[in-house]
Amino acid sequence: MKFTKPNSRQNKPHVEQKTSRRSTNANAVASKNVKKVTEAQPKSVKASTHSVKPTVKNPLVEGEKLQKVLARAGQGSRREIEAMIAENRVSVDGKIATLGDRIDVHAGVKIRIDGHLINLLHAQKEVCRVLMYYKPEGELCTRHDPEGRPTVFDRLPRLTGSRWIAVGRLDINTSGLLLFTTDGELANRLMHPSREVEREYSVRVFGQVDEAMLHRLKKGVQLEDGPANFKEIKFAGGVGMNQWFDVTLMEGRNREVRRLWESQGVQVSRLIRTRYGNISLMKSLPRGGWEEMDLTNVNYLRELVGLPAEVETKLDVTKPRRRAKTGQIRKAVKRYAELNKRYKK
């Protein structure tokens, strides 16, 4: 009789092989899953580490446009500053600026125009100033004339740290109301056609004018730079071939009033701007004279173009100083009068 051992290979050899194969397959699948997890994990960790990496701010990419900041600081209108940038006259932190550059005013950037450092923080504290000027005929709306002819800037009060910016232009043969401001953004918005700020002119024309012509001028005519028209035309007097009209426009293109009349075969012999928005030319203002606007008128212009109102103007800031100076002058005059009386006795 033969006996077999209970733990010998002859007992359940097939079952043992199946078990080992199943365990091997399970281990292989588990190792594959672990491998997939371990392979996917570093990628997510890497991505998260990359996302929390601190970004370095570039003052030339973030912030406001350079020309807008300089315009608000009273260095000129946006158009003037864009011309300066194009001429390589503006630098930011020692590098020549280009159109499209943006800056963060509070980042401590150093901006220079023609080598002169611009104090932006000081300019932000300055209040907005607006002048009404009665431009006479014969003056140019430019800062410098190579021929030495008089300009509208010659008679204006001197400024330190900023400059007067003309709100639009009047040609050499046109007189009347011209606004100046120290806020380039205000000037830019007032001049922009999208704001549709009314300009009123008193115009004397030479030629035959009839109702059909006035109707065409109000409906619109085609000029070389596009269609144009008067919003309003009112007869203001005159006889024969010389007649006066009050006309209103919603934009200020170059010589637009003259060109509109000339398109109908009529010549303009006199042109005076009398109103800009609701600001009318003061009758008491002499030709070549200027008057600084009060807070009410300054804020009217700012709100007209969507800018925040000012709390005070230069007139309010300097009022105590001017009052003290006036008092000193009065005392000096009184003292002088008393000395004269004593001397005569």
From Swiss-Prot:
Keyword Oxidoreductase: no
Catalytic activity of the protein: uridine(2605) in 23S rRNA = pseudouridine(2605) in 23S rRNA
SMART domains: S4
Skewed-composition ranges (Polar residues): 1-10
Sequence ranges assigned to domain S4 RNA-binding in this UniProt record: 64-136
Molecular function via GO: 23S rRNA pseudouridine(2605) synthase activity; RNA binding
Keyword list, A-Z: Isomerase, RNA-binding, rRNA processing
Source species, domain of life: Bacteria
Chain positions covered by the region annotation Disordered: 1-60
Cross-referenced Pfam families: PseudoU_synth_2, S4
EC numbers for this chain: 5.4.99.22
Active site: 171
Biological process (GO), any one: enzyme-directed rRNA pseudouridine synthesis
Keyword Cell membrane on entry: no
Gene3D superfamilies: Pseudouridine synthase, RNA-binding S4 domain
Enzyme class: isomerase
PANTHER family for the chain: PSEUDOURIDINE SYNTHASE FAMILY PROTEIN-RELATED, RIBOSOMAL LARGE SUBUNIT PSEUDOURIDINE SYNTHASE B
Role this protein plays: Responsible for synthesis of pseudouridine from uracil-2605 in 23S ribosomal RNA.
Entry similarity comment: Belongs to the pseudouridine synthase RsuA family.
Protein name: Ribosomal large subunit pseudouridine synthase B
Organism: Pasteurella multocida (strain Pm70)
Organism phylogeny: Bacteria, Pseudomonadati, Pseudomonadota, Gammaproteobacteria, Pasteurellales
